[in-house]
């Protein structure tokens, strides 16, 4: 069931936060998720990723936050241990309206799509963050495949930094839920300024 504003998605609760445009690598071994992946590849559809707030990734049920991200499979392989490995990429954000559990334990959600953020350039006061990201991605390597970097785009820079900086999952979730690129950069700049202040104090 799909409309311009709503859809039905299989949910994959995880202890991580997926951002639009971000990479996600998973090892798939539970039957419910093997079936989900098979269906997604057969129908060229995606699945929903949402941060767990109660429960576990493997086995049983898990409760999640309300805001998640659509993931679309872009590659798959058989891993050395024989399990299925998939690479997915985040697309658009959604808000969970209702969840039910199917007989195989798979959570299926009715979701409402969230609007994409309006494009905004990185404000001059946050240009240092774009440069920080550039240097970090040079160290990390091709984590984003053939995606062309957009160091002038406030949303792209903020989301990529939110993925690679050492933040708690709930902090990443807070950044995912922000709807404004420059506001996300302000959050990150404030956090980095606080950390630098603590580091300076520890050196005294």
Residue ranges: model-predicted function:
Residues 1-204:
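N-terminal low-complexity, acidic/polar interaction/targeting segments
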């Amino acid at each position: 069931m799909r409309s311009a504003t709503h859809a039905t998605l299989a949910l994959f609760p995880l202890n991580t936060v997926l951002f639009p445009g971000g990479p996600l690598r998973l090892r798939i071994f539970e039957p419910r998720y093997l079936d989900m992946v098979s269906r997604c590849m057969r129908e060229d559809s995606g699945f929903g990723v949402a941060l767990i707030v109660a429960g576990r990734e493997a086995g049983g049920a898990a409760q999640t936050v309300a805001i998640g991200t659509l993931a679309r499979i872009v590659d798959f392989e058989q891993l050395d241990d024989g399990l299925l490995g998939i690479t997915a990429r985040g697309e658009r954000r959604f808000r969970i309206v209702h969840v039910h559990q199917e007989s195989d334990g798979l959570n299926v959600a009715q979701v409402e799509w969230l609007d994409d953020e309006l494009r905004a350039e990185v404000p001059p006061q946050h240009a240092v963050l774009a440069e920080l990201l550039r240097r970090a991605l040079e160290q990390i390597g091709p984590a984003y495949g053939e995606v062309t970097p957009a160091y002038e785009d406030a949303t792209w820079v903020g989301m990529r930094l939110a993925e690679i900086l050492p933040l708690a999952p709930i902090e990443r979730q807070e950044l995912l839920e922000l709807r404004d690129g420059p506001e996300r950069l302000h959050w990150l700049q404030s956090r980095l300024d606080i950390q630098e202040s603590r580091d300076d104090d520890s050196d005294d």
